[in-house]
């Protein structure tokens, strides 16, 4: 049996402001830092150790991972960064308040943009200042392939090949893996691992900084998955995420 741990970053400044973030490189809030410390403490208490970690190229995931590794006294751990683990690109919604967007377009439309499998938000216009294709962290990504928007299907298409070619060989080699990423990049991986249908994936919400353990068989099929925190904590955290995209009453 193999075991991996998935972790969404702690609360970011735009999580706090209830804004669509996507590839915008925002920082953690003080609460997010404390959430990351709590995740590290929980992993340490439960006896988890790791050989290798993976994360995106966005600071909120990087900082979360570093804080967790510090709590585990494992800052020396090898870490691999890839844009393929980034949050999904939210296109022209990036920077907009979710509740205000829901009030304008309706809760149902925003739910489709946030949680559906194959419907992307409106794309960023050409030349928009929010495009970060010139950023050196994306030097390996051809400009023509740089996303201006993404749906979850697009996120699956970029993450799963990285999982199969980079992460899986290390799992099969017996290395203990921690993946610190984002709500939708983790939803993409979980959809693939658990073979969740396109319609059912709408209801999957990933809370911030809650370690999620996957136990995998010899063929890397899930045996079971579970959060380390208690069920009431997770239910409340998932409900909070689900409510972010609704208009205020």
From Swiss-Prot:
InterPro entries: His_Pase_superF_clade-1, His_PPase_superfam, PG/BPGM_mutase_AS, Phosphogly_mut1. The active site is at residues 9, 87. Pfam families: His_Phos_1. Substrate binds at residues 8-15, 21-22, 60, 87-90, 98, 114-115, 183-184. The record marks 182 as: Transition state stabilizer. Catalyzes the interconversion of 2-phosphoglycerate and 3-phosphoglycerate. Homodimer. This is 2,3-bisphosphoglycerate-dependent phosphoglycerate mutase. It comes from Aromatoleum aromaticum (strain DSM 19018 / LMG 30748 / EbN1) (Azoarcus sp. (strain EbN1)). The lineage of its organism: Bacteria, Pseudomonadati, Pseudomonadota, Betaproteobacteria, Rhodocyclales. The gene is gpmA.
């Amino acid at each position: 049996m193999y075991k991996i741990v998935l972790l969404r970053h702690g609360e970011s400044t735009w999580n706090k402001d209830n804004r669509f973030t996507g590839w915008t490189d925002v920082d953690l809030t003080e609460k997010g830092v404390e959430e990351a410390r709590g995740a590290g403490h929980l992993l340490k208490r439960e006896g988890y150790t790791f050989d290798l970690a993976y994360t995106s190229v966005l600071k909120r995931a990087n900082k979360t991972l570093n804080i967790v590794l510090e709590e585990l006294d494992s800052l020396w751990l090898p870490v691999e960064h890839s844009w393929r683990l980034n949050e999904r690109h939210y296109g022209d919604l990036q920077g907009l308040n979710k509740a205000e967007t829901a009030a304008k377009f309706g809760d149902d439309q925003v739910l489709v943009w946030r949680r559906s499998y194959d419907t992307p938000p409106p794309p960023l216009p050409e030349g928009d200042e929010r495009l970060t294709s010139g950023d050196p962290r994306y030097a390996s990504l051809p400009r023509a392939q740089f996303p201006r928007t993404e749906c979850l299907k697009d996120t699956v298409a970029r993450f799963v090949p990285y999982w199969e070619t980079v992460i899986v060989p290390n799992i099969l080699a017996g290395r203990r893996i921690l993946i610190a990423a984002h709500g939708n990049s983790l939803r993409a991986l979980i959809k693939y691992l658990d073979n969740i249908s396109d319609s059912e994936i709408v209801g999957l919400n990933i809370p911030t900084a809650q370690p999620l353990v996957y136990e995998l068989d010899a063929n890397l099929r899930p045996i079971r998955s579970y959060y380390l925190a208690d069920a009431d904590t997770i239910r409340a955290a998932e409900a909070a995420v689900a409510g972010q995209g609704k208009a205020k009453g």
